[in-house]
Amino acid sequence: MSSDATNDELHRRLFDEGIKVRKDVLGSEYVENALRNATPFTRPGQELITEWAWGTVWQRPGLDRKQRSLLTLGLIIGQKAWLELGLHTRGAINNGVTELEIREAVLHAAVYCGTPSCIEAMIVTQKTINDMVDKGEYKRPEN
C-alpha cells in the first residue's frame, strides 16, 4: 500500500470515528447540517475539526466525555466564543453534565476569565438548557 493510500485511509478512519463522537455529543442534526452546509472553502475546516478534535482528542484515555465537556465549557468561556458555548452546553447535557455542574463551571470561569464573561456565559447556558427543555430534549430532574 502506498504512503498516500495509507495516509488517506488514516484520515478516513479518523473522520469516520470523529463523526460518531461528534454526533453523540452535539447531536446528529447539528453535525449533518454543518457538513451539508460546508462550502469548498469551509469543508477542509470541518474535516480537520472532525478528525483532530473528535476523531483523536475526544477519544483519548484519561478524561471521560463528561470531564471533557466541563473542560471545554471553561475554555470556550475564556475565548468568549458564545455560539460555541451554546453548542457545547447542549453537548455537556448530552454527556451527563448537570445544570448545577454547568452553572458551577461558569462561576468558576468567572474567577479566571472575568465577570463580563460569566454574565454572558450564564445567559447563553441558561438559554440553551431552556431551549432543550422546551423541545423535549432534556428533562430537569425532580427536586
Swiss-Prot record:
Pfam family, one: CMD
Any one Gene Ontology molecular-function term assigned to this protein's record: carboxy-lyase activity
Known pathway: Mycotoxin biosynthesis
UniProt cross-references to SUPFAM superfamilies, sorted A to Z: AhpD-like
Superkingdom, natural source: Eukaryota
InterPro entries per UniProt: 4CMD/NDH-1_regulator (IPR052512), AhpD-like (IPR029032), CMD-like (IPR003779)
Enzyme Commission number(s) of this protein: 4.1.1.-
Cofactor(s) annotated in UniProt: Mg(2+)
Keyword Lyase: yes
Keywords: Decarboxylase, Lyase
Physiological role: Nitrosuccinic acid decarboxylase; part of the gene cluster that mediates the biosynthesis of the deadly neurotoxic nitroalkane 3-nitropropanoic acid (3-NPA) that acts as an antimetabolite of succinate and irreversibly inhibits succinate dehydrogenase and disrupts mitochondrial oxidative phosphorylation. NpaB facilitates decarboxylation of nitrosuccinic acid produced by the nitrosuccinic acid synthase npaA to yield the final product of the cluster, the lethal mycotoxin 3-NPA.
Family: Belongs to the carboxymuconolactone decarboxylase family.
Name by which UniProt lists this protein: Nitrosuccinic acid decarboxylase npaB
